[in-house]
Structures are given as C-alpha cells and as structure tokens.
From Swiss-Prot:
Species of origin: Olivierus martensii (Manchurian scorpion)
Disulfide bond positions: C4-C54, C29-C50, C51-C59
Subcellular location: Secreted
BP GO annotations: envenomation resulting in negative regulation of voltage-gated potassium channel activity in another organism
Protein name: Kunitz-type serine protease inhibitor BmKTT-1
General remark: Negative results: has no effect on chymotrypsin and elastase.
Function: Dual-function toxin that completely inhibits trypsin activity at a molar ratio of 1:1 (Ki=136 nM) and that inhibits mKv1.3/KCNA3 potassium channel currents (IC(50)=129.7 nM).
Amino acid sequence: QKDCSLPVDTGRGKGWFLRYYYNKNSKTCESFIYGGVGGNKNNFLNIENCCKICKAKNC
C-alpha cells in the first residue's frame, strides 16, 4: 500500500492513456492521463484496481 501514497506522475512519452491514481489527501481514486513511459506505481489501469489496492473511500 505504500505505492498508494506516491504523488500522481503522468510519466513521459506521447501516449494518451486513461489511468487512475490514489489521492492520499482526498482518500479517493482519481483519473489522469498517462504518457506511457516512466511514472510510478500509483498508476492503475482501472478504478476497481485502485479501489481494491488502496482502499479508497469513493469505491
């Protein structure tokens, strides 16, 4: 769960991928656009995985 406390990181690259991250301040999973390269582990393919792993309150 320590990955859930990492800040959102859109990464590099020219990709346009809809992803989700856990916002530790609001304790919710939120969407962001991922560039496709780099970033960190607070990056989920769907909101369900974000909710399951980070136990967000908006799930």
